[in-house]
Amino acid sequence: MNEAYSPAAPRPMGSTSPSTMKMFMCFLSVFMVVQTIGTVLFCLYLHMKMDKMEEVLSLNEDYIFLRKVQKCQTGEDQKSTLLDCEKVLKGFQDLQCKDRTASEELPKFEMHRGHEHPHLKSRNETSVAEEKRQPIATHLAGVKSNTTVRVLKWMTTSYAPTSSLISYHEGKLKVEKAGLYYIYSQVSFCTKAAASAPFTLYIYLYLPMEEDRLLMKGLDTHSTSTALCELQSIREGGVFELRQGDMVFVNVTDSTAVNVNPGNTYFGMFKL
């Protein structure tokens, strides 16, 4: 009995497993990252190497030029060389002239600035010392007031000292640098027979956040039998420790009686 022949079915080709593909992709990624890093490092190394080679070549060119100059000056093997000694020596002389001109211009420039280059440090120290020696002081003259005021007003005069470290604000003197200060004031005033209470001069330390502090006080009681004004003066002065930003001012019992003729009424301070 004949049986029909049927060929065997082809075996299916084996497919690549997902884990193998994943490992291959990871390996490829790592390889590319390593290659990129290596390329960057190699480029950096090559750049540094080229910079170093440029320095070496520059030094080599200088050496060759000096060697040419030496040969031309000593006459060494002039017949066996193809050097144009006249051209080489002229170039060397030009370089010397440029260097000499630059070295001469530098002292002139420094001389124009006051010989600073040899004594720059000492001059700076001298300037600082002179700044420190400049007095910190101010002296003000009185200003007439026709109404009663709590704080006497003042003005600068052409003959009196002023300092940027002592500023004036509406009758008050403000110190910009802490330290010991001598504070003084004189007030001249007129008394009449009708006046019975003493005329009092006050010098206060201004305290914005609390009550003003009395530094000095002067009194004068002078009776007169005439109705005319008789001129009197009260003067106060003392040394006080002031902080940066402290302000002082002058007050009197009757500001309308103050005489502000030149030299009669003044207010000032200076740092010790």
UniProtKB/Swiss-Prot annotation:
Positions of the record's site feature: Cleavage: E110, M111
Residues listed as glycosylation sites in the UniProt record = N124, N146, N251
Where the protein is mainly located, per its record? membrane
Please provide the record's keywords in A-Z order.
Answer: Cell membrane, Cytokine, Disulfide bond, Glycoprotein, Membrane, Secreted, Signal-anchor, Transmembrane, Transmembrane helix
Q: Any idea where the THD domain is?
A: 136-272
What would be the name of the gene that encodes this protein? CD40LG
Q: List the disulfide bonds.
A: C190-C229
Stored Gene3D superfamilies = 2.60.120.40
Q: List the subcellular locations.
A: Cell membrane; Cell surface
Which BP terms in the Gene Ontology apply to this protein?
Answer: B cell proliferation; cell surface receptor signaling pathway; immune response; inflammatory response; platelet activation; positive regulation of canonical NF-kappaB signal transduction; positive regulation of extrinsic apoptotic signaling pathway
One GO CC annotation: plasma membrane
Q: Which GO MF terms does the UniProt record name?
A: CD40 receptor binding; cytokine activity; tumor necrosis factor receptor binding
Free-text description of this protein's post-translational modifications in UniProt: The soluble form derives from the membrane form by proteolytic processing.
What does this protein do, in the record's words?
Cytokine that acts as a ligand to CD40/TNFRSF5. Costimulates T-cell proliferation and cytokine production. Induces the activation of NF-kappa-B. Mediates B-cell proliferation in the absence of co-stimulus as well as IgE production in the presence of IL4. Involved in immunoglobulin class switching.
Membrane-spanning intervals of the chain = 24-44
What's this protein's family per the entry? Answer: Belongs to the tumor necrosis factor family.
This protein's assembly is summarised as: Homotrimer. Interacts with CD28. CD40 ligand, soluble form: Exists as either a monomer or a homotrimer. Forms a ternary complex between CD40 and integrins for CD40-CD40LG signaling.
Q: What is this protein called?
A: CD40 ligand
